[in-house]
Amino acid sequence: MIKEFIKRDGTIVPFDASKALGWGKWGAKGFAKFIDWQKIVVQTVSQMPERCKAKDFNDGLIRNALNEDTWAGQLMAGRIYATDIHKEVFGGKKRRSLREVHDIMQAANVMVVLNYSDTEYAQIEEWIDHERDFHCAHYQLKQGRDKYALRNRISKRVYETRQHALMRVAMVVCEQHDPITRMARLESMFSDLSHERLSAPTPNHNNMGTGHNGFFSCCLFTCGDTKESITASTVIAEVMTYMSAGLGENMQVRSLGDPIRGGSIIHSGKIPYYGKQTGVVKSNKQGSRGGSLNEFFSGFDPEVTELMVLKNPRTPINKRNRSIDYTMMLNNWLLAKSSADEEIYLFNAFSAPDLYAAMYGKSLDAFVELYEKYEADESFEKTYVSARKLVVNARSEGFETGRFYLLLIDEVNYHTPHRDPILSSNLCVEITQPTHYYDHLTELYSEKFLGFITFDTEEKQGMLLDSNEPVEIKGMVGAVAAIELKEGVEFRKKGTFTYSRVTRVIETRREPEVSLCALAAIIVTNCETEEQYAECAYNALYMIDYCIDNNHYALPHMKLTAQARRNAGVGIMDLAHHMARKKLSYTSQEGLMEIHRVGERHAYHLIRASIRLGQERGNAEWIHKTDWPRGWTPLHTYNQNVDTLAPFVYHYDWNQVSLDLIAQGGGRFSSLIAHMPGESSSKYSAATNSLMPLRYLSILKTDGDNSMIWVAPEADTLKEWYTIAWNMTRKDFTNLYAVIQKWTDMSISADDYQTFKGDEKISSSALIEETNYMAFMGRKSLYYTNSETSDKEALATVMTRKVRRDVDEDGLDLSGPVCTSDGCSV
C-alpha cells in the first residue's frame, strides 16, 4: 500500500487516495460505463510499494487497464500514456511549439532544416491539436513512440509527440509545392494524416525530414540466364537489402542437368543460386534480423518438385532452405489439367523460351497453342508430372509451412493496365509490375535507357529506336512503346504525320528494370464523405509522387526507370471495422455488395486523382507502356464470374472515367492500387489489417523486440458484429478477394485461414476444387496460409489473446511480418 508519492520533480508528498481516484476517473472519461476504472486504481495502489514514483504508478494503471482486454481499457491506458509521452517530449507540463521541437532536433542532427518561414510555422502551430493524442488507443501511441517518432536510440530520448511526427511527414511532402497554395495543401495533408484517413508507410515516418531519403521498402527484380546477369542480380539483392527493402525475385536460370557450353558443363540448377541470394540477403541486417526474400518460380519448372519443398522442415537439411519464402506461379491451363487429373510436361526459359515467354502473356489461348505444338514435337524432350499432385503438394506446403505462396500469373498479366510482361510479384505478393533482367552489373549504374529495337521499313534499312519511345500504330488508339513493333505493322513516331511499314525486325532488347513500390493506404472507416475520400486519394498519390521524385536511388538506372514508370500502390485499411460498424458479415450477399461499393469507390477516386495529378504535373513518361491512355479501367479486364456472387450495382460513371483517361492520355501513375498486409498501420492508426477479417478481438502483437496488446477498434460495442477469420471458409475468402480484385489493377496480400478440429484433414479433391475456384473467380494470389487446431465456435464469442510469435527448430521466426522494414506495412 502506498504511503508516500515521489513526483516527477523528485518532491515527496503523502499519498492522496482521492487524487489517485481522480486520475483514474479522468483516464476513463467518456467511456466509464465500459470499464471499472475504480477497480483498476485500487488494484494498482495495492501493487505499489509504500514509496511509489509517479511514473511507476502510471505504468501500473496502464498495465492494469490493458489487462482488461477491452477497447475501453486501451483508451484509458492510452490517455495516461499520452501524458507520459508529452512530459517526456516537453520536459514538463508546458508544451513546446513545433518550431522549438524542430530547432532541438536540428541541433541534435536528427532532422534537416525545412524551408518554412516563421510566419508559416506560426500558422502550422494553429493546426496542431495535441488533445487528439488523449483519444488514442495505447498501442497507437506506443507504436508511434517506439517506431515512428524521431529519437536518439543511444540516449533513448524521444523528440516528437504523435502530432509532431505526423506534421513532419506532411511538411516534408508539401515543402516543394507551389508557394501560392502550399499551406492549403499542407493543411489538407496533415488533416488526413492526423484524422487517420491516410496511412503512410514506415519509411516515410522514419526518414522524412532526416536527410535519409529512402522511401521504397519493397522491390521486384528478375535474373537472366547468364553469369553476368546472375552477378547483377546479386548486386541488386545486396544493395536493396541494405536499403531496407524486402525483395521478390524471378530467377530465370537453367535447371539442374541443363547443358552449359554445349554440354561441357552440367548446370547445378536454381537451388544453389537461391542459397547464394539467401546469404547475401541475410548477411545484411534490417533492424534486428537479416533481410527478406521471396523467390518466384514457374509451376512448369523442371525442378518444381524440389523447389516447392525447400521450406518444409521435413525436407533433408542438405536440400532445404527455410530462410527465405517461395511463390509458385500457376496458370489456368495447369489448373485445368489438375482438375482433369492429367499430366503436364515441364519446361523452362532455356528449353522452350517462346513457351516460357507466352506463360507471361495476355492470351492463355496463345500459350495453350504453343504448349500443344511442343507436346506434338517428338524431338522436344519432355518430362511429365501429375498436375493434380503438383497442385495438391503446393497447397499442402502452404498449410505445413504457412509461407509458401501462389500467384496466378495469367490473371496477373491479363487484369492489368501494363503492356509489358509481369514476371513476378514482391515479398508480400501484392505488387504486380513489369521487370526485366540486366545483362551486366555495370548497366545498373547507367544514366541512360538501354533498351532498343532495330528494324527495316519499306523506306529505310536498319532503323534504330529506343525501345521505350512512344510510337503510334495505325488502327490503335494512343501510343505504345517501340518494342511492340512487329513485321507488317504501320507506325509513325509520335508527333509526325507519315506512317511507315515495318518489313523486318532485326533485334530487340527490352529495357532492364527493377520495379520499386511506393505505398500508402486509405482508412475507409474515417472517410465519411465522397469529398473526403477524393481528397485523401489525391493526398495519397501526392505523397507517393514526392517519394518517387525525392528517393535516394542507390543504383542510378533504377532512378531512370522508377521515375519513368511511376508506380503507386494505394490500399484499403480497416475494412473489418467498417463492416462491423455497418453490422454486415463478410459472407452475406449484403456484405459482399458493401465490399464491392468500397472497392469501387477506392478505384474511382484514385483514378480521378491520377488524372488530376497528370493534368497538374504531367503524365508518367512511360504511360504509353500501359493501357490507361486507351481508357483502361479495371472494368475492362476483370473476371466477370465475380458478378455471380451478388446483384452488384455501380455508383460512378465509368464510361466518363474512360473518356477522361483518353482525353488526358492516361495519368500520373502506371500502377495505382495494391492491398498490402498493413501490419504496422493496424497499430499506429487503430485500424484493422488491410481487407482481412479479425483473427481475434484481442491479440498480443510482436514486432522485433517490442510487443503490445492490440484490441479491435470499438470492440466493446461492436464485438458481435466483427467477422472472425477462423469462422470463414476458404471459399469465403476467395469471394472476398475476388470482389476487391475486380477493382484492383495490381494484387492483394491475400491470406487464407483454416481451423482444424481434432484429426480433421483436407482431401486432395477439396484442394484441387478450391484452387481452381480461385482461378475461376479471378483471384491473383495466395499469401499466408494460417491454420491452427481450435474450437471454432469459441472463436466467435470469446476475446482470446493470442501471441503471434512462433519460432521453429531452425531458429526462424515464423510469425511474420517477414519484412522487418515494414515496407508493405503502411
Question: Each PLM stretch: what is its role?
Answer:
Residues 1-826:
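Extended catalytic cores of very large enzyme megasubunits
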